[in-house]
Amino acid sequence: MAKEITAQQVFGLLPRRRQDSHKGSYGKVMCLAGSARFRGAAALAAEGALRAGAGLVTLASVEPVIAAVAARCPECVFLPCRQSAGGGVSAQSGKAVLEKVRGMDVLLFGPGLGDTPDTAALLEQLGPSAGCALVLDADGLNAAAKMDSLPRSPGLPLILTPHPGEMARLCGLTIAEVNAGREGIAAGYARAEDCVVVLKGHRTIVAGPQGEVFVNPTGNPGLSRGGSGDILAGMIAGLAAQGLPPLDAAVCGVWLHGAAADQCAKRLGQYGMLPHDLFADLGALFAAAER
C-alpha cells in the first residue's frame, strides 16, 4: 500500500549544508538537454538542479540553447555540442560528452532533446558508459522505450520520470491502462527494471525497486504546463548528486516541486502561474527546511 509523502519526511531527508564545504561537496550534474525548438527545457532543467542544491551543473547542448540559458542562468557551466540537421544535439557529440560525464555524479538525459535518431544514438552511447547515476526524462524516455533494454551503467542508480504517455510507451500499454492502475504499474516496472519510477500526474507516484510506493499529496493544476516536468527532473538530479539515495531524491523532489507550486498558486493563481515562477517559492521552502 502506498505511503503518503509528508513534509516532516522530506525535511528530515534533505542534506544539511556544512560550514566547511565547497561546490564539490554538493555534487556535479550533467544535463544533456535542449534543441533549437525546445531551448527553455534545458534552462528549466539546469536551474532546477541548481536550485535543489547541486554544487556544479554542466549543460551539454547546442550553441543556440547555450546562448539562451547563459543569459538566464549564468551559474551553469557549458559544453557546446555539434548540432544535428534538426537542431538538436548530434550523435557525433557522444564522445566529447562521455569524456566530461565520467567526472559527474548524475547525468540528466532528455529534456527538450527531441525524439530523433540522434537522441537514441546518444542514449545508447552514454547510458551504459556514463559511470554515474542516470535520470531519464522526456525524450530520453521516448528513446529508451524503443530499445530492447534500458541503457544504464551496471550497478548504478536509474531514475525514470515519465508522464502517463511515456509510461505507456515504456510498458507497451495504453494511457488509459496506465491511468487505471498507476500504483501497480509504477511499482511493477520499478521492481522489474531495478530502478526508481516517478509516474507524474495528479498525486504523483514514486516507486522503488524493493516494492516501495509513495504518493505525493502536493501540487495543483497550475503545473499543467510545458516546462513543469523539466524543473522536476532537474531537481531530482540535483538532489541525487548531493548523495541522497535515488528513492529519497525522487520523494523529496516531487514533494518540494508540488509544495512550491501550491505556494505559487496562492500568489499568482493557477491560471497565471508559470513553471519558472516556482523557483521563488522553492527557495522559500528550502529556507524553511534549514531552520
PLM feature segments, named:
Residues 1-133, 142-159, 164-291:
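Small-residue (G/A/S/T)-rich helix-start motifs and N-terminal tracts that mark the onset
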